[in-house]
A protein has these predicted regions:
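Active-site-adjacent beta-strand/loop module that shapes the phosphate/pyrophosphate-binding cleft
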Residues: 215-240
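Glycine-rich phosphate/ribose-binding loops and adjacent secondary-structure elements
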Residues: 171-172, 186, 190
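Cys/His-rich short segments
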Residues: 110-155
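N-terminal strand-loop-strand
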Residues: 137-179, 205-206, 229
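Conserved small/polar residues in nucleotide/adenosyl-binding loops
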Residues: 252-260
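A gly/proline- and charged-residue-enriched helix-loop-helix capping module
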Residues: 85-111, 115-118
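Hydrophobic alpha-helical positions that pack around
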Residues: 180, 194, 198
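N-terminal alpha-helical interaction blocks
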Residues: 1-97
Length: 260
């Protein structure tokens, strides 16, 4: 999980004089791909000075806030990139750049995606406009307000003594395992979601839930809530079509992942 307290970042919705300077960070996306500098071998976001040389069309532009005294912006663009820049998915920069950069890029992508999917009112179909105060879209025809979408989800580490439960999603390659995770359904508490997801995916009951922490997870717009839980009862039965295999693994048999 990346830093829980990003003290150096101040969220802002209204632009201020002196924010959009030459060193302002531009998290610019073409589709869901981030435009990065490639000269150093480490993916880095572009700056306002860099962007001046781009011959692209800006479809959306949003102030995110101030990070270490520098303005941060999210942009949606269309067009060709100049030499020395590349398009990279966010998963491609995870582990290869500072976690603060990944956090801000994820925040930017969710903002751009929200803009792209809320151009028209979901209630009456009229065009949406920017809300004058909040980060929101306002329908001036019927008054409907659309805020950025968040999909709460849980991820849980189930333990039994010195062993932990790992599972492989049916869509993943052989050898790729993770802890269990799933989305919160309407009307559920997050604790109920933990119990339901574990039962659905592997047929086990758990107990002694302990909240661990949360993080934004921009794939595409999740708020991930982490838990520890202890095995209570049952035998592993993998959910058909969802879980290919699941097993208990000793901590001592785990190896640390390499950087992407």
């Amino acid at each position: 999980m990346w830093p829980k307290d990003l003290d150096d970042f101040e969220p802002l919705t209204n632009d201020e004089e002196g924010l959009d300077t030459g060193d302002a960070l531009y998290f610019a996306f073409k589709g869901d791909q981030l435009i990065c500098k490639t000269s150093s071998g480490v993916p880095e976001p572009i700056t306002a000075d860099d962007f001046r040389w781009f011959d692209v069309e800006t479809s959306s532009r949003h102030l995110l806030g101030r990070f270490r005294g520098v303005g941060c912006y999210a942009l949606g663009v269309e067009g060709n990139l100049p030499e020395g820049y590349s398009l990279t998915g966010l998963r491609g920069i995870l582990g290869r750049t500072a976690m603060e950069t990944f956090y801000l890029a994820g925040r930017a992508l969710q903002t751009v995606e929200w803009h792209n999917t809320n151009k028209f009112c979901g209630r009456c179909g009229a065009p949406m406009s920017e809300h004058p105060q909040d980060r929101a879209k306002l329908c001036e025809s019927c008054g409907f307000i659309a805020y950025p979408r968040l999909s709460p989800s849980i991820i849980v580490l189930v333990t039994k003594g010195e062993e932990m439960l790992l599972a492989r999603n049916a869509a993943w390659p052989n050898g790729m395992f993770s802890t269990l995770a799933g989305f919160v359904e309407a009307g559920e508490s997050i604790e109920q979601t933990v119990h339901r997801e574990v039962m659905e995916e592997v047929g086990l009951r758990v107990k002694n839930l302990k909240y661990f922490g949360s993080q934004s997870w921009p794939f595409p717009n999740s708020l991930m809530l982490g838990f520890h839980a202890e095995y209570d009862s049952g035998d592993i039965v993998c959910q058909p079509g969802e879980i290919a295999e699941a097993k208990s693994v000793s901590y001592t048999h785990l190896t640390l992942p390499t950087k992407a």
